[in-house]
């Protein structure tokens, strides 16, 4: 009986541990992402793919659609590494193919985990 109580206690404790899931490619972003009409992701992708000679470093806004209020921009984050324009084009194409229309993030590295580095398209305060 004592062993059963120990097993049940262990199973209960294990069930209470938080489940951690890596957030892979996704169409998440600011709450304002849903307010925009049209398919801005394609415009962002086309800008980036039209200028593949650029280097994209963390925080630099390389492709953007500027609006009167907020704007949408693509940038690298969650890493210290830069990526090539060709890589940026590939990641933005991944987002378009995933069905993202305005905002989203694509992991930079194998493992589909954006916490290790990501190319993000999201609303920003200014161009």
From Swiss-Prot:
Alphabetized Gene3D superfamilies for the sequence: Killer Toxin P4, subunit A
Pfam families with a match to the protein in the record: Kp4 (PF09044)
Covalent S-S links between cysteines: 27-100, 33-103, 49-89, 57-82, 66-127
Subcellular location: Secreted
Reported biotechnological use: The KP4 toxin expressed in transgenic plant can render them resistant to KP4-susceptible fungal pathogens such as grass smut fungi. Successful tests have been made in tobacco and wheat.
Leader peptide range in chain numbering: 1-22
A GO cellular-component term linked to this record: extracellular region
UniProt entry keywords in alphabetical sequence: Disulfide bond, Secreted, Signal, Toxin
Record has Signal as a keyword: yes
Major place of residence: secreted
SUPFAM superfamilies linked to this entry: Yeast killer toxins
UniProt GO MF annotations: toxin activity
Subunit structure: Monomer.
Function: This protein is lethal to sensitive cells of the same or related species. It specifically inhibits voltage-gated calcium channels. It inhibits cell growth and division by blocking calcium import.
Protein name according to UniProt: KP4 killer toxin
